[in-house]
């Protein structure tokens, strides 16, 4: 899960940054970009998109869900918390 990936990242890189940015939020479709930065270097970038109302959680929290997915993807691209794919089914 993303929370475990964040904990692991913080343990490895206590001074690292996880920077999220809403790239677009038009007509209920949100796109978020996440950059993982350590020592002023971008180590990974992840993107995610979510549609308002497309699932139970997205009825109220599609932007938050999109941000979490983007963070999880960026950390996965770094190799944190992946076994077989960047995102798990639950994520």
PLM segments and residue spans:
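Polyanion-binding surfaces on beta-sheet-dominated domains and ring/shell assemblies
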Residues: 1-91
């Amino acid at each position: 899960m993303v929370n475990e990936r964040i904990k692991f990242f913080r343990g490895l890189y206590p001074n690292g940054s996880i920077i999220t940015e809403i790239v677009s939020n038009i007509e209920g479709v949100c796109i978020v970009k996440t950059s993982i930065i350590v020592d002023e270097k971008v180590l990974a970038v992840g993107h995610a998109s979510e549609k308002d109302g497309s699932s139970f959680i997205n009825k109220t929290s599609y932007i938050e869900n999109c941000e979490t997915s983007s963070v999880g993807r960026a950390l996965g691209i770094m190799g944190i918390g992946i076994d077989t794919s960047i995102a798990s089914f639950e994520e």
